Regions:
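An alpha-helical interface "stripe"
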Residues: 1-256
Length: 256
């Protein structure tokens, strides 16, 4: 099956259109901020959903009704917390709500609430973006970029991504998909090592640069037959670093 048919006619249809599918919302790549937030989804969730409406109005007053400034500062706080978390699963589990400027804001509504049942869960905004560019700039220069096939968001917050492979081109998720993910990660890790040598003791740059890989709940690759889940890709980092330092890195091993 051709990759575009797999992506558009099957997966995107299942994610967004079918009544027995996931009922996600598709959003455009140009609505995603440089720090990987779907700004309108985040804004909607913290300002219009049941447990956030009143709190948001109160919060907005502290910003003299400057909504743009509020959102920018709020995303900065979230981005920092994400960087301090092991991954997005732990971030969401530990930050179902946050206190911002003294005001409690919910970030996610769990299902099965004793009081609300699943009603609040239904207010969560699950979104996907096709062909979303990830670009990392350092000191005004582009260091790394790639474009995952599908990227997933929850209430405007990045969750993970998926790479698709097509047997039409004699490719498979097992071989080419996993290799593509490993190749992208090793390229990013090597570029990070080049700019961070001696300058990233606190790993601030790493937390920002490699977050799309290392913070993802999971990275998946799929074809028409199989799906593979890659977790904890950061476990490869020390090996990549060691082999780069002693010039023994086998780049051919990671070719997609």
């Amino acid at each position: 099956m051709d990759k575009l048919i797999l992506q558009d006619k099957y997966l995107m249809n299942f994610f967004t259109q079918r009544t027995d599918g996931l009922q996600y919302k598709e959003v455009k790549a140009n609505t995603v901020s440089k720090n990987h937030f779907v700004v309108e989804d985040l804004k909607y969730f913290i300002s219009e959903t049941s447990l956030n409406k009143t709190a948001y109005r109160k919060l907005l007053k502290t910003f003299a009704n400057n909504e743009k400034q509020l959102l920018e500062e709020f995303m900065e706080v979230l981005n920092k917390r994400i960087g301090e978390s092991m991954n997005m699963a732990l971030f969401i589990n530990n930050n179902k709500s946050v206190t911002f400027k003294g005001v409690k804001i919910n970030l996610f509504y769990p299902s099965g609430s004793i009081t609300h049942g699943d009603a609040l869960f239904e207010e969560n905004q699950f979104s996907i973006v096709q062909e979303l560019p990830y670009i990392y700039n350092y000191e005004g220069k582009k260091q790394f970029s790639f474009r995952p096939d599908i990227t997933f968001f929850l209430n405007g917050i990045f969750l993970g991504y998926s790479e698709l492979k097509s047997n039409y081109n004699n490719q498979s998720a097992h071989k080419n998909g996993k290799a593509k993910i490993a190749n992208d990660y090793q390229k990013a890790a090597i570029n990070y090592l080049e700019i961070a040598e001696g300058n990233d003791i606190s790993q601030t740059i790493r937390k920002d640069f490699l977050k799309i890989f290392e913070k993802a709940i999971h990275i998946t690759t799929t074809d028409v037959q199989d799906t593979f889940v890659i977790r904890n890709i950061s476990s490869q980092f020390d090996e990549i670093k060691a082999r780069v330092e002693d010039n023994s890195f086998d780049f051919d091993k990671y070719k997609a």
